[in-house]
Amino acid sequence: MIRMTKRKILVTSALPYANAGLHLGHMLEQIQTDIWVRFQKMRGHECYYVCADDTHGAPIMLAAEKRGITPEQLVNEVRELHVADSQGFLIGHDNYYSTNSPENKALAEQVYLALKADDKIACRTIEQLFDPEKQMFLPDRFVKGECPKCSAKDQYGDNCEVCGATYAPTELKNPYSAVSGAKPVLKTSEHFFFRLGECADFLKAWTSGASRRADGAVQPHLQPESLNKMNEWIGGGLQDWDISRDAPYFGFEIPGAPGKYFYVWLDAPIGYMASFKNLCERLNLNFDEWFAKDSQTEMYHFIGKDILYFHALFWPAMLNYSGLRAPTGVFAHGFLTVDGQKMSKSRGTFIQAKSYLDCGLNPEWMRYYIAAKLNGRIEDIDLNLNDFVARVNSDLVGKFVNIASRSAGFIAKRFDGMLAAQVSDGEILAKLQAAAEELAAAYEAREYAKALRDVMALADIVNGYVDANKPWELAKQEGQDARLQDVCTVLVNAFRLLAIYLKPVLPKLAEGVEAFLDVAPLSWHDAETLLLGKKINAYQHLMQRIDPALIDKLIEANKQNMQAIQDAPAAAAHEPLAETIKIDDFAKVDLRVGKVLECNFVEGSDKLLQFKVDLGFETRNIFSGIRKAYQEPEKLVGRHVIVVANLAERKMRFGVSQGMIVCASGVDDSEGLFLLDVDAGVKPGMRVG
């Protein structure tokens, strides 16, 4: 086996926002990260995994106010939930901290002052929407109104989820405060900006570049899909980044600027550093060795694809121009769907981590299933609940655990727990040992699905050996004791090798294997040796099959009480009626029935679907921002929709949109988006009025 140079590796996953417990979407990322970290530690590298709660911002402040507690009380309460959720799924954080910490305050100020000294901070007067009832400036997401481009109602202050347009909140038509429902007014305020536009040359080089690791391997900073997106954004021109917010705000006050606070996206990524600094103080590590400009250590961020902009542009630029090292790699992943659709509270598929554990499901079942779907690319993965049951029961119980259960008992009963001193069927074990480096390469590249496919293929070979040698029959035959011990020793060693290869994914089960074999914690290099002439303990069953009834219990536990929602009083924040119009104004809008001929995802967009719609007299190409509500676009083919047919064509970067598809939505976007149905017999081109 190849002995690798010891590496020093710092790993993070995205900071969960401190407003609620974790759900399976969070766990996908933490599991992906944890598997990689456990693998690196098994290889003998010095590897640390840190995370923290993202605690600052207006939403935290307002949520605490609503409950009558302080923001500090709220974030401390939620942190306890997050720690319990993570530990329940066997996530091995070396430190789980908070962005509301003295270390983060000091580091945020240090970074800001360094950027200011390098003339990367600008002060400008801006106009911003202000809630006259709450006496506060409104963040973009707390302003709603009509899209200035397509007039879709109930859109956020920064982008339209219907047509995909981006804009300033001041451009919204008929805006209202999502906090109080009041009509906001414009007020001026001085804000601080990070001059991101001046960082384009550095970012072009960094995003397309790579770092050389201590073992000599070259690590690209970004995945190919991420690089393509960054090239698009950099090519379109980078805008300076507003890094300040006005009081009242829960966060850190900017040095020398009373009443001004760091925007959450400035101090949140610095929270990675703060969590690690806190760990360094506890373990007596040299923090500067890891974050100095010329650091030879490695730093990796595991994130969701929706926060790429911050981690692949804003964060490395901020680090570089404050005199610190940039990341070695940013690894983005896709979203989690359940049974082919976005997680849904009403369907019971918005699964909370705590609920999964409380229903009695083994966290290693989910760790294995998610790993079996993950690769190094930015692809959404689907948790198919029927497949989840079938795969775990087949792979982990039927193939893997079955090897030990069919052999270990004979070693205990017939040979007093003693393995044979040598084996005659060494070829099968040599084959398993030879797979170690290829499996290691798959784990290193985050190609977990490939690694687990290969491990299960090896398990199939071992189970073939079981069936060919039938230890239960050997046990009945006189004079076959030596052969029985030989065969069972081969099987116990094969089980041990497979357990080594699965340990990053199944750490608790691996502990059970280590106790059964009476060995020290298994490392990757232990695959080089065999366990011979050693006494082992009696085998204890390591994993149960999934009872499908547990899945039914889980779904029921996560179903939202729809009747309670229907009976609940209306929220204080409501969308005011638009300005009264005359019948002549309405007559200007030409609504037509259309029939969907084609519907596809739009590459490069997380929000849009591309429709080809038959309007009777012609076929139109229409982009619609309803992807999150319709995860299976092929199922919309043949459906009738309502189209604003005389809307001016709009050129988008994906093509020209020739109309708008009408949808229904509530004030709260969590209520969903819904296409409108028409009765049978309708024909494309019919006018709606």
From Swiss-Prot:
Superkingdom is Bacteria
Matching Pfam families, A to Z?
Anticodon_1, tRNA-synt_1g, tRNA_bind
DNA damage found in the keyword field: no
Q: What keywords are assigned to this protein?
A: Aminoacyl-tRNA synthetase, ATP-binding, Cytoplasm, Ligase, Metal-binding, Nucleotide-binding, Protein biosynthesis, RNA-binding, tRNA-binding, Zinc
What CDD domains does this protein's entry cite?
A: Anticodon_Ia_Met, MetRS_core, tRNA_bind_EcMetRS_like
Give the location of motif 'HIGH' region in residue numbers: 16-26
GO cellular component, alphabetical, reads: cytosol
Hey, what's the signal peptide range on this chain? none
Q: Where in the cell is it found?
A: Cytoplasm
| Reaction it catalyzes | tRNA(Met) + L-methionine + ATP = L-methionyl-tRNA(Met) + AMP + diphosphate
**Entries under HAMAP family matching the protein:** Met_tRNA_synth_type1
Q: Which family does it belong to?
A: Belongs to the class-I aminoacyl-tRNA synthetase family. MetG type 1 subfamily.
Subunit info here reads: Homodimer.
**Official protein name in the record:** Methionine--tRNA ligase
**Organism whose genome encodes this protein:** Chromobacterium violaceum (strain ATCC 12472 / DSM 30191 / JCM 1249 / CCUG 213 / NBRC 12614 / NCIMB 9131 / NCTC 9757 / MK)
Q: State which gene encodes it.
A: metG
